[in-house]
Amino acid sequence: MRRVLEKPGIIFGGFLGLATLSIMNTAYTNVLDDIKSELILNYTWAGALMSGYFVGYTLGQIPWGIISDRYGSRKAMALSVLGISLSTLLFGYSSNIVMAVAFRFLSGLLGAGIFVPGVKLVSSWFNSEERGTALGLLTIGGSSGMILASWVVPVLSVSLSWRGSLRLMGVLGIISAMICFYFLKDRNQQNTRQLNFKDIPIQEPSFWYLSIIQFIRLGAYYTFIAWMPLVLKEEYGLSILATSSAMSILNFAGILSNPAGGMAADRFGEKRVLIAGFFSLMLFILLFTFGLGGPVLYLLVFLLGWSINFTRSPAFSIIPGLFGTETAGSVSGVNNTFASFGALVLPFVLGYVRDTTQSYVIGWYSVAALSLLAGLLMGLVSEPEL
């Protein structure tokens, strides 16, 4: 940990970039009820707001990878933070669902240049024994951003409306982009080899297992982020304050479990950590469907946040050990594309299931089954080299 913190600019710049990404991506979910009412959306269209983002995010993976290879992770990450912030500001001017989905698509397309270049930056500055911890510290930014959004956006919406609150978030994101550019730094010997499809080990079963696992991991994560606030209000009758508290608990768990997952992976191995994380997630999702209220509900929200964030860093830090450091960037980019596709599909499907069945239960059972599948597939992945 001490050696990781010897590079504070890299850690802080990456932290801020991921925090801003999370704020811009999830701010609308905290006022989704207001958006849904004003734009007259059903649950399927409400789910399309998250899916529209990840259509753009998926399409942006390869172009941003090329930009990062050619101009460096620093410029790519700062430019991406700027792009998603401007798109969020424009989302606040949406007058119909077509405009709203278009701006969400643009947010995803322009925001796709933060995470994978960040992984590349971590790989260049930290050795194999430090990467999991470093990436875990960076990803605390994601959970911190969601906590901030879950409190600030609903409070601002009372006086500014949902539109004004999202516009203000966009302006603050533009400032964040400049700060990220100041603190981040590319390493001189950073590998600048461009994306080469020959680097992708399509003949390796473990590559495909990891791709499916990433589809499930991020899809499940954003299903909770997109729908949890509305579920807590509709199914549990929580107030805005109580819902914000619950979402803060979900994301506070991520602040703790992101670095914990990275450190556990450095010590016990990514494979064991990922198997434990996915099986735990399945169990907690099933318990969530029981409709338990009171303190138990808040405990379950914490455990869901813990288990789903515990797998994030190991899911990427395992890649160099399996496929080599030189191909880690290309493999991470492809894996992240699968992850983005999962985040595109699963939130939309849950909204469709809710419209069709008038209940969230079947959707939650499906996410639990996919979590079980991810744990089983992880058992088939080869052991990474030390």
Annotate each language-model stretch with its function.
Residues S87, V98-L106, P295-L303:
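Paired small-residue
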Residues I40, G72, Y93-M99, N127, ...:
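Helix-breaking motifs and short loop linkers at transmembrane-helix boundaries and internal kinks
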Residues L59-S95, K271:
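Conserved MFS/SLC helix-loop-helix module at the cytosolic interface between two early adjacent transmembrane helices
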Residues I10-Y43, F224-P229, L346:
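Extracytoplasmic
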Residues Y28-T29, S206-N258:
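Extracytoplasmic gate region of multi-pass secondary transporters
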Residues F103-G141:
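Cytoplasmic helix-loop-helix junction between adjacent transmembrane helices
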Residues E270-I318:
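C-terminal transmembrane helical hairpin of 12-TM major facilitator-type secondary transporters
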Residues L137-L184:
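Helix-loop-helix hairpin linking two adjacent transmembrane segments in secondary transporters
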